Amino acid sequence: MGTEVVAVALPGREGRIAEKPVTQLHTLVDMLVKVLPVDLPFAFFGHSLGAIVGFELARQLHERSMPLPQHLFISASLAPHLCRRDISRARLSDAELLRLLEGFGGTPREVLRHPELRDMVLSILRADFNLIDEYSVPDGYTTRLPITAYAGTMDNNVSLDRIMAWDRWATDDFSLHLFEGDHFYLVRQRRSLIGSLLGKWHEGT
């Protein structure tokens, strides 16, 4: 039997661009739990914010006594217990957010120069920061999963020690794999990343 990849399109993005972005993580996870197919073995892959969404989704599945992912693949993300900030980045001015976005890389300059597109991107970024900057792992959560972490060697946004901190939430099966590139290394390293993901997934299934 082959492996099926199911992509998650969040409100306010891609084909759902006309919808209002979700700003509360529990609301987003509730939406995902309702549509998640759990009748076959599955794993989660999340890049940046998506890694935290995957972690919290797994936590909610555990809380509801539903099947858990057999593996959690995270990319370019700090560990969940390090997310919460005293002041959310969603409160930054447009100019401050824009500088932050430029530091991430991955967004074409043409988009940032176009007022309407730039405002749309900043709106999504604010929603993302609302999701992640006020998140904290609830007390008493002890379930551990096999976790594989990925990162770019030149990612200036997430330090390796913050990525390595994911081992706190892993079983003995934790590993880190580095690819040449920045926060969006996976754009150029897609083929190698997919090969690694499938290889690790097939090892455990």
Task: Name every feature range the model reports, one short phrase each.
Residues 1-205:
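Non-catalytic, mobile gating and regulatory segments of ester bond hydrolases
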